[in-house]
């Protein structure tokens, strides 16, 4: 079994790290460079920076933050938010990022996935998927014919892809989209459950497992991490390759090392 990864996520707005619940109610969580240094020292396998205002408010990309972080932190850094072109990829990679995450632009212009992977390599292209459960009230609905339906504790649902920072539904089925981005040349999927995001109630294991089982790409589970048990569940039940978390690290509820120790206790390989 490949080593599982623990990845702190830093949502960045106007140069500061913020955290919210269900993609709203944001509060300040610190300086991105300083937090990155802390997580690096704690043993994080990678870092993810998401400029959460970039796609929606058309903000410039956070090149300065990336440069300052890359000068001091030497683990892989993935950067996303408002990246729309191959030139945007190039600028961020030159600033010191190792991978680029795209979401809205991937949905709007899927050929960007193919183009970027051909130029920079598939390992550089991460497709971020913000996904929400769509519960079924009328099973006879004609529009459900092409959807992948899953049974959950709260009822039957399909999983819908959202864009613009979770503000706009696309009608796209998440399973189908995962398969498509794999075929287009994505190297990894960053999978966020909008329902679980910021709740600390655990990852959406039905969603994570569904995507993991329907693509060969590595899956980063995101949204809902509240403790080490949730991370173990993401790996064991969700079949994720990596687990992303924010709140529990930013507010010092635990360290990366704490999480890794608990994961290792469950006979899941991690790197110290």
UniProtKB/Swiss-Prot annotation:
It is found in: Cytoplasm. Pathway: Amino-acid biosynthesis; L-histidine biosynthesis; L-histidine from 5-phospho-alpha-D-ribose 1-diphosphate: step 5/9. Disulfide bonds: none annotated. The active site is at residues 11, 130. It comes from the Archaea. GO terms for biological process: L-histidine biosynthetic process. Belongs to the HisA/HisF family. This is Imidazole glycerol phosphate synthase subunit HisF.
């Amino acid at each position: 079994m490949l080593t599982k990864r623990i990845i702190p996520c830093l949502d960045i707005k106007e140069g500061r790290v913020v955290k919210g619940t269900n993609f709203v109610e944001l509060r300040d969580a610190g300086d991105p460079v300083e937090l990155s240094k802390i997580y690096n020292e704690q043993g994080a396998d990678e870092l993810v920076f998401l400029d959460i205002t970039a796609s929606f408010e058309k903000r410039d990309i956070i090149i300065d933050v990336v440069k300052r972080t890359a000068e001091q932190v030497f683990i892989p850094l993935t950067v996303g938010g408002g990246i729309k072109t191959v030139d945007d990829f190039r600028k961020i990679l030159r600033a010191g990022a190792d991978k680029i995450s795209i979401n809205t632009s991937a949905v709007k212009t899927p050929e960007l996935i193919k183009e970027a992977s051909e130029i920079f390599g598939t390992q550089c292209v991460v497709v971020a998927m913000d996904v929400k459960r769509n519960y079924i009230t009328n099973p006879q609905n004609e529009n459900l014919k092409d959807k992948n339906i899953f049974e959950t504790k709260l009822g039957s649902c399909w999983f819908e892809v959202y864009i613009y920072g979770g503000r706009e539904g696309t009608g796209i089925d998440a399973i189908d989209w995962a398969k498509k981005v794999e075929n287009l040349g994505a190297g990894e999927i960053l999978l966020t459950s909008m329902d679980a995001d910021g709740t600390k109630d655990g990852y959406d294991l039905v969603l994570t497992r569904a995507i993991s089982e329907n693509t060969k790409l590595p899956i980063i589970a995101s949204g809902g991490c509240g403790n080490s048990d949730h991370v173990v569940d993401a790996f064991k039940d969700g079949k994720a390759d990596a687990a992303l978390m924010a709140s529990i690290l930013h507010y010092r509820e635990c360290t990366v090392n704490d999480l890794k120790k608990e994961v290792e206790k469950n006979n899941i390989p991690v790197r110290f």
